[in-house]
A protein has these predicted regions:
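Helix-to-loop junction immediately C-terminal to a conserved catalytic motif
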Residues: 49
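Conserved ABC ATPase "signature" region
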Residues: 65, 102, 113-131, 179
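Conserved structural motif at the start of ABC-family nucleotide-binding domains
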Residues: 3, 18-20, 77
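Conserved ABC ATPase signature
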Residues: 135-139, 143-145
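Conserved catalytic motifs of ABC-family nucleotide-binding domains
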Residues: 156
Length: 223
């Protein structure tokens, strides 16, 4: 099992965000997290990705207890195992597309030729190789989202976490992005976890997990 969450709870002061969450996710699965605003979808993604810590509970990735990792070992683990796609892109406006993609490997000690090769390979897969020398003011919203996906893939992660990845896109580009994530999960055996309210996203997910009132209330298989 790629991801195991055991009795995971998160509280802010006296407010319970979620409690005693138990969940297993396999490689190659697309998992959709749904729920009302403030239900804990983004918080759960952030905890899996190491941006926040749970109040209680355990997280295992590839049978490794990741909450026990410290310092450099912890940073290296998250950098290599997990790629993020954020709602607001978080791309550097002064850098070229190729440089934005390569930012994910800043601390990987890769040679420049290896970095260039990886960027070109990923960009070709995502059909953005023709814009690698462009600045961000020259790309569309759909292309910007593909750049984010390319950056998330740069370190060859086992997991991609996507927080509302289609919110800033028109319906056509939104569906194209989800199709790409679906294909990546299948072909690369990457677990893709998406938080979204979109019914369209649900149609591409293997599992739909609803978070409500601090708990997982429904887990349904859709494929």
């Amino acid at each position: 099992m790629l991801i195991q969450l055991k009795n995971l709870s998160k509280r802010f002061d006296q407010k319970v965000i979620f409690e005693n969450v138990n969940l297993e996710i396999e490689a190659g699965q697309v998992v959709l997290l749904t729920g009302n605003s403030g239900s804990g979808k983004s918080t759960l993604l952030n905890i899996i990705g190491g941006l926040e810590r749970p109040t209680t509970g355990e997280i295992f990735i590839n049978n490794r207890d990741i909450l026990k990792l410290k310092g450099r070992e912890r940073a290296d683990f998250y950098r290599r195992q997990i790629g993020f796609i954020f709602q607001d892109f978080y791309l550097h406006p002064q850098l070229k597309v190729s440089e934005n993609i390569a930012l994910a490997g800043t601390f990987a000690n890769l040679k420049s030729a290896e970095t260039k090769h990886k960027v070109e390979l990923i960009a070709k897969t995502l059909h953005i190789d023709s814009i690698l020398n462009h600045k961000l003011d020259q790309v569309s919203g759909g292309q910007a989202e593909r750049i984010c996906i390319a950056r998330a893939l740069f370190m060859s992660p086992k997991i991609i976490l996507a927080d509302e990845p289609t919110n800033n896109l028109d319906p056509t580009n939104a569906e194209n992005v989800i199709k790409i994530l679906r294909a990546i999960a299948t072909s690369m055996k990457i677990a893709v976890i998406i938080s979204s309210h979109s019914q369209m996203v649900a149609s591409y997910a293997d599992r739909i997990i609803n978070i409500s009132q601090g708990a997982i209330h429904e887990i349904s298989q859709t494929r």
